[in-house]
Amino acid sequence: MEGGKGEGKRMKEEAPSKKLPPKIYGGDAGTPTKAAHDEILSSLLRINNFDSISSIKDESLDIDLSACVTISSASLVNGNSLSSTDFWRVLDESAQNNTELNLSSDVCRDDLAATSSSTVPSTLTSDNHSSSEFSVTFLRPEPPNAFTNSPFKKTSSSGTSTPVKLSPEQLHQQHQLQMPQSQLLQRKPKLPAATAVRLKVFKEEPPEEKHPPEQVVTKVEVCESELLPPSFTIFQQAKSAESVADAASMPPPAASETKPLEVDPAPLHKCLDCNGLLLETPDEVAKHEAAAHRLRLTYRCSECQREFELLAGLKKHLKTHRTEGRKDTWKKCPDCGKCLKLGSMWMHRKIHSDNKKYQCDICGQKFVQKINLTHHARIHSSEKPYECPECQKRFQERSHLQRHQKYHAQTRSYRCEKCGKMYKTERCLKVHNLVHLEQRPFACTVCDKSFISNSKLKQHSNIHTGMRPFKCNYCPRDFTNFPNWLKHTRRRHKVDHKTGEHLENIPSYCSKKSTTNKAQKAAAAAAAAAAASSAVNPNELSASSELKAKANLTSTAAPAPAKQARKKKQPQQATLAALGITLPAGTALQQVHPVPLAQQHQQELTTVLVPLAPPAPKQTKAKRERKQLAPKQLQQKPQLLQQGQPQQSSLEPIPAVPQIKKEPVQTQGPFLDLHGLSLTSAEELIMEQALEMEECGLYDAPNANTEMGTSDNAISDSAAALHFQIKNELPDELLPDDDFLPCKPSDRLPCPSLESSPFSSPASMELTAVSCASSVAISTNALPVRSGNYYLPAFTLNAHGKLSSTGNGVQSVTTSLAQTPSVSMVNVPLLVRSNQMLPSVDTLLFTNQTGGSRFFAGKSATAATPHLT
């Protein structure tokens, strides 16, 4: 029981104790039955003039309150109840354990709150009245072993309580001295066979002057603190002063048994989540749930204002703000020098001991704990019991799965302080922080580069060693490191390297060539056409309009799909750039497509240069070199007119075309060694060198001859068949001397090579001076012998389809085999048989002649050596 200290003071309702009730000692003999309870309580009512026996039964708690008696001083106190069962249990424990029984106001309050007083509202009293002390005697039948040496509390003059042991006679005398005179007169004799127990109860008298409101008002306050969650405090006021006066003027207990006591109705609603908060109406319950239960309780750190959902998380976080760590937090292992926490050190020390009871049956490794052996056994069994729900990847350890699941998270909570990059895991951030280190301890022994990790150095060393361990699964390309292989697989083939699925929204390499889309290109083409039409005079406009009308009539008869028109467009700008031709600023190429055959006599295909407005300046980025365009795109020929139709001048006059100057490109010095390059790299190098040499004028384009076929400079089917037939019939030996043709050292002649090896290109064939001591008989028309480059001779096919080597009809070649010649220097491999199945680059570019006229007609063919060594 406790009393309020003032009118403004409010009393918090304590939460019910979660501890289990103490065990009742003494068994059935020491604990009174229900009938004994009723007899004791009825005796108390007759002797001490108590109020009544409460016959309330709280259904919410399922506790029968009929065994509880309301104790009051002068019948003025109402609202505090005490269970007789709990009272006898306390007495049994104190008697058998011989311990101190502390029945002060605080302990009484806790005991009452833990048992049955949680549903009974507390009372508020005024501080104008001082508390009065009175004594109550509880009677119970005397057990077989009477209580002896029961401890009680003796109040000193200073206000402190000192536990003492008093005899029953001393207790009786002290009780008579302290009891008021009015109570001594009303006191009745005790029952015989009973034990007297005196309790000191401090209770505050009810107010006399102030009249509280008639209705019970329930007030709820939220007490907030820094570390603890808000708790609801309940305050209730007494109903009215009239009820207190009625309680004082109640009839004696005998009459109260017949007349039931009017009790306040229990609250209709109770919140089970807020320490038993009592609410009257459903509206209050709804408002309370909307205001309180939807709020998220958080705990905020006072140092960094970080919020936590649990108090334990906040306490753990507060340890990080310590200026100095605890001395015993980390310990150093004396055996291996590893630093561990104090709680983990004792388990770590067992690793260095010989007491390892758990041994693996497969490899014989021993472990200290059984769980370590279980984890080790999964290595041999390849068991992975933990599966990722996102990607179905399995792991052997739970910690590995938890670390993997962070990669699926969309949030990147780890930020680099130097560059601001965000990462999903702390491990990724630590790896990234190595980039910002000034020290790069891993240096390459071949070049002067250094790296932050050994793995980066190993990837770099593959460049020097030539190792390309990462090979593409879809093409013959290989790479020195994994990032380049991954980028090639995803962008070039658009395939996921893990699952093999096709990727849709992955940019390809071609997207880097141009940043403009098709709509922008179409708009630019329309603007160019409009500018060109405005520059033409009115006569030309009328002529062009007539041509357009005729074209519309023919198009209605045989409409052509739009996709075919797109295919006819040729990248002329890229073709000119590949050939090294630069156009003046502000010019563009406009291609006029040929008209149908019925109108070919009126107009022919023309190319017009149209001035354009200067484009907006753009930042040029360094792009890596691409493969050159195909030969068909390099040299486009207009379609030949049908025989019998005379070529007529076009109706539209051709404007003057400005001179296009060819800028010579500096050629590389000595040719690179092609032995160390792959086939793809060698072909690219040969293509570039061949184009550069043609642009510089080192090779003269031969006269066009379409005897072999009517196609363009690309090799035809018959030429390809002839090419492979020659390869099969030529022996693997060195070519005889009469199969070579000399040339002047100042003239570089085209080389229609028939060999398809990477070394067969004219850019890579460079045969130097060949000395000879033999006598050569030359005709009168033959030129003197000069040392220079030598190539394959002309050839013809006989009637049986066999290859026969022939010389020019004007020339006569004789060779003396008396002396053996010698070669001074050859800096390229010999022309031998190759296993490659496709024609070489130079064959595609420069082979367009057949028969004997394909080699230097009008020159004498002479040879100097029968063999090359």
UniProtKB/Swiss-Prot annotation:
Segments of skewed composition (Low complexity): 630-648
SUPFAM superfamilies for the chain: beta-beta-alpha zinc fingers (SSF57667)
Family matches, as SMART domains: ZnF_C2H2
A single Gene Ontology CC term: nucleus
MF terms (GO), sorted A to Z: DNA binding; DNA-binding transcription factor activity; RNA polymerase II cis-regulatory region sequence-specific DNA binding; zinc ion binding
Ranges for region Disordered: 1-32, 134-165, 554-573, 617-652
Alphabetic keyword roster: Developmental protein, DNA-binding, Metal-binding, Nucleus, Repeat, Transcription, Transcription regulation, Zinc, Zinc-finger
Tissue specificity: Distribution varies between nurse cells and the oocyte during oogenesis. Weakly expressed in follicle and border cells.
A GO BP entry: regulation of transcription by RNA polymerase II
Predominant location category: nucleus
Compositionally biased intervals (Polar residues): 146-164
Matches recorded under InterPro entries: Zinc_finger, Znf_C2H2_sf, Znf_C2H2_type
Basic and acidic residues composition bias: residue spans: 1-17
Function: May belong to a complex set of multifingered proteins which play an important role in gene activation or regulation at early embryonic stages through a maximal accumulation of their transcripts (or protein product) in the mature oocyte.
This protein's name: Serendipity locus protein H-1
Organism (species): Drosophila melanogaster (Fruit fly)
Classification of source organism: Eukaryota, Metazoa, Ecdysozoa, Arthropoda, Hexapoda
